[in-house]
Curated annotation (Swiss-Prot):
Top-level lineage group: Eukaryota
GO annotation terms (biological process): DNA recombination; DNA repair; mitotic cell cycle phase transition; nucleosome assembly; regulation of G2/M transition of mitotic cell cycle; root meristem growth; vegetative meristem growth
Known partners and oligomeric status: Component of the chromatin assembly factor 1 (CAF-1) complex, composed of FSM (FAS1), FAS2 and MSI1.
Similarity-based family: Belongs to the CHAF1A family.
Coiled-coil annotated residue ranges, if any: 329-439
Region: Disordered, residue numbers: 317-473, 638-682, 919-940
Keywords carried by this UniProt record: Chromatin regulator, Coiled coil, DNA damage, DNA recombination, DNA repair, Nucleus, Transcription, Transcription regulation
Compositionally biased region (Basic and acidic residues): 330-429, 445-461
Protein known as: Chromatin assembly factor 1 subunit FSM
General function of this protein: Component of the chromatin assembly factor complex (CAF-1) involved in chromatin assembly following DNA replication and DNA repair. Required for several aspects of development, including apical meristem maintenance by regulating the durations of the S- and G2-phases of the cell cycle through its chromatin assembly activity.
Annotated organism of origin: Oryza sativa subsp. japonica (Rice)
GO cellular component, one term: CAF-1 complex
Pfam families attached to this UniProt entry: Cac1_C, CAF1A_dimeriz
Consequences of knocking out this gene: Dwarf and weak seedling that dies during vegetative phase.
Length: 940
């Protein structure tokens, strides 16, 4: 037979798989003993094996308990527990140095006693006869309470059992791992080998997994010794944990760890308690064994007698009554002994239950005390938290009050700023009124009769002797002085010439164009972002002339105070003044002006046009050494290149690319609105007070007529001028509200016939020369020519043809003429834009590129009436008839105005000064009607 079968190991595999099974058992044992305290399964204590803790006296024992070996350690533990209770709420050290040293010394002393007692308990080896036991039972008896490693233990058992049949080293090893386990009752390192380690502090001990393998008479002592070893292990573990807490750095402040360690140490049985427990268990087993022995001794004489009679063959007559009597007596004695033993056991159990109850009561009291203290601590923490919350609320309230105060201060500051802005606005309005008055006075001087000019001729010698004064003091006298110089120039008839007037006018236009910011090249006419919310009218020529001729305040300040620094010098370029002289006069007044240089900025790889203009501010951040820094005063997101989009040449910016469905939908919407929403106010309708105030103007005229006749005629002219300005402002606002341009023409002047009149002398000749200068157009030959009247429709067609010829490259000729009829058919059936039209053609001609198709469409068709239509010459070439175009007349802007928005005819006839001619002419493209209004009255 094989060794595996002999040892009772169930291995259905062959013998060569024994090593794998051994490795599996070894791995299981390693996993089980990986913990630091108990390996595999430990023996459990019976309820009757429990013992009182530490200072509780041992009662109900047959012999008095011996004296404690370490009373100093118990006193030290009690004293430590009292100190921990007193210093639980304090922040100082948990133990004094003397108490700590005493506790460490007591623990070490008790640890030595426990190790010695463990050797006494575990030093027993079983005595048995090998022939009377099975192989597994013999191996179990040999490995029980052995401290050797696995290899040495297997060798020792194999030496003793090698005489038996079927025993080998491999079978012994597998049987040891199968029926036995190695327990650790001490303290060992985590890296130690569980099956081979033999350190003394680990207290290794081999035990059988099931006591049924051991003979019956040996089970009682083994169970008692296992209980003793388990109690020793619990005490050693508690002592080691206490020493680790005491030896750890900063252990004086770890009150909770000390309390837990002392509680664990007090719960574990000390050395004296373990000895008492072992002694009682031994007495119990002895009593049970004595009772069993008594019963067996009573039966032995009868068995010997029967045996002897059977052996010798002699049958004696024994009195049956005497035999029964002896038997009953023995049975009574046995029952009595058993009752006595049971009584003692019950009494011991009762005493132990009482002790356990008392111990449980003490533990409950300790827990209640601990809970009470924890509750008090929680209440204190709650109060502290409440106080902190109240402090935080108070702080938040103060912060809120401060925020309210700051808010009120800020509000007051804003109100003060608003008041200041209001005052500044009033000052600006007052300044505007003064400018209007100045303009009126200028017009008044312009319309003065010849008497004023004659008055200016008399003190002519005084003008030559005028001394140059400070330009800052002569700012208000510039405009009247210029007017007087012009009047005096008109009075000198012999000095006037056509070339001189032309040259003077051209030089004036050049100077004015340098100050017109909107005349620079490269300006974006249609930016994506509106520069202004509403159109701002340009200043009058008088205000602009005043601004040009006004001296620079910073220049005057620097001329008067050269050494004094000016903070605004960093923002404005200070340039020298230039004297402005008038041609044909002897009067020269040096007027300082600002000759501002213009700058051209062009960036590489930028699609946007170059910047051309004046930039007079100096940045405090951007400079020659750091040109790539960002100025915080500039907004770099507004004028970024992302907003710029290149427009395709020849594309219409209108809604020409709408689908046919969208156009039909819009027409239906317009029809529905006209039919259903006829009660709505139409676009362009104005209320009673929003139209041209003709009634108020007529009232002014009536008031002027009712004034006394001796009033000056200049007042009437001034009123007429104000009325004209009011009408102009009203028409301008109306045009802005409708987003429609307002063209003001002055072609029908009352003195237009002077241009063609001849044989004029005196003032009429001078007026004719002035009108010729104003109406002339500079040509290469230098002669004055009239612009011919050009039909707008023919000019538009010619420009369209030129654009189409320029935009059609030679690549369009790549399409054969055979496909021209199909292309014309698609163009005639499609009412969409150029992009969708090209898509439709590309589906029919996929071999031709879209760019060639687009060029071909632009070559043979033109965009008319919001759609692409084939040219007539192309249709005639193909022999096709041109489809009649939809003659939908565009709506004029005059249809959006009601009659109340325009002056009545009787008002125009009654007031010659307010005679306004409203003409509507087509613009260059012929798409919309722009109202043209003649501002100045006509004599016709």
């Amino acid at each position: 037979m094989e060794g595996g079968k002999l040892l009772g190991v169930a291995h259905p595999e062959p013998a060569n798989n024994i090593d794998a099974d051994l490795r599996y058992d070894l791995g299981q044992s390693r996993m089980q003993v990986d913990g630091p305290v108990v390996l595999n399964r430990s023996a459990e204590l019976e309820p009757s094996d429990s013992m009182a803790i530490d200072d509780v006296p041992v009662e109900a024992s047959s012999q008095p308990a011996p004296a404690k070996q370490s009373p100093a350690l118990m006193d030290t533990i009690v004293e430590v527990q009292k100190q921990l209770k007193r210093k639980r709420a304090s922040s100082g050290p948990a133990l004094a140095a003397a108490d700590k040293d005493a506790l460490v010394a007591g623990c070490c002393q008790e640890l030595e006693g426990l190790l010695e007692y463990y050797r006494e308990v575990s030093g027993h080896r079983m005595q048995f006869e090998v022939g009377n036991l099975s192989t597994n039972a013999a191996i179990g008896c040999l490995l029980e309470e052995s401290s050797l490693g696995l290899s040495k233990l297997v060798d020792e058992i194999y030496e003793k059992l090698k005489g038996m049949e079927g025993v080998s080293a491999t079978s012994v090893r597998s049987s040891v791992l199968l029926i036995g386990q190695r327990m650790m009752y001490g303290q060992s390192s985590p890296d130690a080998d569980v099956l081979e380690d033999e350190s003394e502090t680990a207290l290794w001990c081999w035990e059988v997994r099931d006591l049924k393998v051991i003979p019956l008479r040996m089970r009682g002592p083994l169970s008692t010794r296992r209980t003793a070893r388990k109690k020793i292990h619990e005490r050693i573990t508690a002592i080691y944990s206490t020493l680790s807490v005491l030896e750890a750095p900063g252990a004086e402040a770890q009150v909770n760890d000390m309390r837990k360690a002392s509680l664990k140490l007090s719960k574990a049985l000390n050395l004296e308690g373990i000895k008492s427990l072992v002694e009682r268990a031994t007495q119990k087993s002895n009593i049970e064994r004595g009772a069993k022995n008594t019963g067996s001794t009573a039966k032995e004489p009868m068995q010997e007698m029967v045996k002897s009679n059977n052996d010798t063959g002699i049958i004696e007559n024994v009195d049956d009554s005497q035999l029964q009597k002896n038997t009953s007596t023995n049975e009574k004695d046995t029952q009595k002994a058993q009752k006595q033993v049971e009584k003692e056991l019950k009494q011991k159990e009762k005493e132990e239950a009482r002790m356990r109850k008392q111990q449980k009561k003490q533990q409950e009291e300790a827990l209640r005390e601990q809970k009470r203290r924890e509750k008090e601590e929680a209440e204190m923490k709650k109060q502290q938290r409440k106080q902190e919350e109240e402090a935080q609320k108070e702080q938040k309230r103060r912060e809120k009050e401060e925020a309210e105060t700051r808010k009120q201060q800020k509000k007051q500051q804003e109100e003060a700023e608003k008041e200041q802005k209001r005052r500044e606005k009033e000052a600006v309005q007052l300044k505007k009124q003064l400018a209007i008055q100045k303009q009126a006075s200028m017009m008044e001087r312009f319309f003065k009769n010849k008497k004023d000019s004659e008055k200016l001729e008399k003190p002519g010698g005084k003008d030559s002797g005028v001394q140059t004064t400070d330009p800052c003091t002569t700012n208000k006298e510039v405009v009247p002085l210029v007017t007087s110089i012009i009047d005096s120039s008109f009075s000198q008839k012999e000095n006037w010439a056509l070339e001189d007037l032309r040259r003077l006018q051209i030089s004036g236009w050049q100077k004015l164009s340098s100050y017109n910011r909107s005349s620079r090249w490269g300006i974006r006419n249609k930016p994506k972002k509106e520069a202004f919310k509403e159109l701002k009218l340009q200043k009058t020529s008088d205000n602009m002339l005043e601004e040009i001729l006004s001296p620079n305040e910073d220049t005057c300040h620097n001329l008067s105070q050269e050494n004094e620094p000016d903070k605004s010098a960093n923002d404005v370029d200070m340039l020298p003044a230039v004297e402005l002289q008038f041609h044909g006069t002897n009067h020269a007044n040096p007027l300082p002006t600002r000759s501002i240089k213009r700058k051209l900025l062009q960036f590489d790889k930028s699609n946007r046009p170059a910047y051309y203009g004046t930039w007079r501010k100096k940045s405090a951040v951007v400079g020659p050494r750091c040109p790539l820094k960002m100025d915080p005063d500039l907004d770099y997101e507004v004028d970024s290149d992302d907003e710029w989009e290149e427009e395709d040449p020849g594309e219409s910016l209108s809604d020409c690319e709408k689908d046919n469905d969208e156009v039909m939908e819009e027409d239906s919407k317009i029809t529905d609105e006209e039919s259903e929403d006829s009660f709505f106010v139409p676009d362009g309708y104005l209320s009673d007070n929003e139209g041209i105030q003709i009634e108020s103007l007529l009232d002014d005229k009536d008031e002027a007529s009712s004034s006394p006749p001796d009033q000056c005629a200049e007042v009437e002219e001034f009123r007429a001028l104000l009325r004209q300005q009011k009408v102009l402002n009203t028409l301008t606002e109306q045009a802005l509200r409708k987003s429609q341009p307002l063209v003001i023409s002055n072609l029908t002047h009352e003195k237009a016939e002077l241009l063609t009149a001849g044989d004029l002398k005196g003032t009429s000749k001078i007026e004719q020369l002035c009108l010729q200068v104003l109406s002339m157009r500079i040509c290469p030959g230098g002669a004055t020519i009239d612009l011919p009247v050009i039909d707008s429709s023919s000019a538009n067609a010619e420009e369209t043809n030129q654009l189409n010829v320029k935009s059609s490259p030679a690549a369009a000729s790549a399409i054969p003429d055979t496909d021209l009829a199909e292309i014309v058919k698609v163009i005639g059936s499609c009412r969409d834009g150029i992009n969708k039209l090209v898509e439709s053609l590309h589906q029919k001609f996929p071999n031709v590129s879209k760019s060639q198709l687009k060029n071909k469409v632009r070559e043979i068709s033109e965009f008319v009436d919001n759609r692409w239509q084939v040219k007539k010459e192309v249709l005639s070439k193909l022999g096709l008839s041109s489809s009649p175009a939809s003659s939908k007349k565009p709506k004029s802007i005059a249809t959006y105005f009601s009659k109340r928005c325009l002056p009545p005819e009787e008002a125009i006839l009654a007031s010659p000064e307010l005679r306004l001619k409203s003409k509507t002419t087509q613009n260059v493209n012929g798409d919309t009607d722009i109202p043209r209004i003649n501002l100045l009255p006509s004599s016709q």
